[in-house]
Amino acid sequence: MPTSAAPVPAVAAQSPTTRKAIANNFRELTKDPKKLDEAANQLYESLLEDAVTGIFIEVHHLRKIGNLSALDGVAEESAHRICDVPNLDIFGVSTAKKAIDCTCPNCDRLVAAARFAPHLEKCMGMGRISSRIASRRLATKEGTSASSNSSYVHSGANAGGTDDEDDVDWSSDKRKKKSTQNSRNNGSKKNNGKTF
């Protein structure tokens, strides 16, 4: 019954005499079914009138300030269409993977994106193999022109040269010899030198 739930919050804020009056009115309305229907209709009409009045006031306010189009909301651009074309998804976007090409800043070649980093290493001479080759070149140059190069560097005339000639971090003497197959198997714990 909607009539019994509505006056409960208002009763708590009112004085005790008003609560008694509301309770007495409620008991009278619930005793007679004819009055109960009348009270329910009055409550329904009151709620409907409040809702309609609220909407009317809101529309009137929006019209006065010029925002009546805001009541309509944002119009959809077009209905969503499902695309049924091969090699396209339902939205019409291609599903085929596109090869992305990058331009090398050093040699201006087009290179696939997956191969760009290795190409750039080789192109600029900064990869592992390139640095080994460059180190070997420096080592051979040091051996042939060590006397002329050292007098040039120590005189302080290294204006345009690189800093690589003075590096002590690499030496060709420190290379380890590769172990042979025989030397690895001689001390092995697997067969202790026994043949089966």
Curated annotation (Swiss-Prot):
Statement: the UniProt record of this protein carries the keyword Phosphoprotein: yes
UniProt xrefs under Pfam families: Sgf11
Compartmental location: Nucleus, Nucleoplasm; Cytoplasm
Gene Ontology MF annotations: transcription coactivator activity; zinc ion binding
Signal peptide interval: none
GO biological process, one term: protein transport
Gene Ontology cellular component list: cytoplasm; DUBm complex; nuclear pore; nucleoplasm; SAGA complex
Positions with biased composition (Polar residues): 142-153
Zinc finger extent (SGF11-type): 102-123
Residue numbers spanned by region Disordered: 140-196
Biased composition (Low complexity): 182-196
PTM sites of type Phosphoserine: S172
Keyword terms of this UniProt record: Activator, Chromatin regulator, Cytoplasm, Metal-binding, mRNA transport, Nucleus, Phosphoprotein, Protein transport, Transcription, Transcription regulation, Translocation, Transport, Zinc, Zinc-finger
Family matches, as PANTHER family: ATAXIN-7-LIKE PROTEIN 3
Protein name listed in UniProt: SAGA-associated factor 11 homolog
Organism: Drosophila persimilis
Gene, per the UniProt record: Sgf11
